[in-house]
Amino acid sequence: MVSEAPPFWWTKADWRAYALWPFSWVYGRIAGMRMDRARRATSAVPLICIGNFTVGGAGKTPTAIAIARAARARGLKPAFLSRGYGGSLDVTTVVDPEHHRARDVGDEPLLLAREALTVICRRRVDGARKLAAEGADIIIMDDGFQSARLVFDFALLVVDSGRGIGNGHLVPSGPVRAPIGNQLRHANALLKLGHGSAADPLVRRAARAGKPVYVAETVRTDAGSLDGVKVLAWAGIADPEKFFKTVRETGAVIEETRSFPDHHHFSEDEIADLIDRAASRGYTLVTTAKDMVRLEPGHGRAGELAAKSRVIEIEVRFDDPAAPGKIIDAALASARARRLRERKAG
């Protein structure tokens, strides 16, 4: 089981956040120095990093998919690089969605592999080499912005408009992964995702630092009406309330919800409880695509839960349809300039 982020991270800072501040100060110093001073390897092909400021989800994976689709539309061969968080494999692996399970490679890589070539690797440098050898001509890295292992040709940081950066404190006082100033210094642009004002102070700070700010929203893409349907909504993601809000926007009537930790692997008892609870009350089960890939058909009642659950499919849609192309063009230009510098230095 993957542990959950403390709820107090996402509310106004209280005594718990301030009690942990000395540890956050040390953590921030180390994280900031690592980002600024680490020696980074270069990728043989252009590399775009989709990251975020905080621990947990902000919409990185659907954003990465949107960029990949735009790259493919331009005739490029995009590929994804992921650490494979939540999976057990610790070797460089090309993800096969027909063969691998979430327990092997992680749930997000399985989603990415449905779109394009995907490699998981504990050492992202090795993963980038593998993707180049496999014929990718642009790499999209899902997360890993703070790891300071690779040179990014473009780094896009996603911030959720509803959550922002929580209480604004660094781990463990809050969800922020490294000092905001250090993160902005290594970012090329921000993506403000969704509706709400929680991200506005950060957006203004980024704009003052000269960083472009793109705007996008998540839109539902699955077919079929849920208007008036009584549902039991279940999700094991970083922000389940965001999913439940999406379900309500479909017109569904949420009678019950079940929340699990992000990347959670469901037990037989949990699966049985969801199935039996919905059946006894006549509710329709609804969940996310990320949760669905963690179910293992053929293992106990997991296949039954998968068959009885409706997936709310979403995608990221930029307000400016040209924005993904601008990001790709900037990454390609940066990579060309980087290679020219490398040749001159060599």
Curated annotation (Swiss-Prot):
GO MF assignments: ATP binding; tetraacyldisaccharide 4'-kinase activity
InterPro entries on file: LpxK, P-loop_NTPase
This protein's UniProt keywords: ATP-binding, Kinase, Lipid A biosynthesis, Lipid biosynthesis, Lipid metabolism, Nucleotide-binding, Transferase
Cellular component per GO, a single term: plasma membrane
A Pfam family that the UniProt record links to this protein: LpxK
UniProt binding sites for ATP: T54, V55, G56, G57, A58, G59, K60, T61
Protein name: Tetraacyldisaccharide 4'-kinase
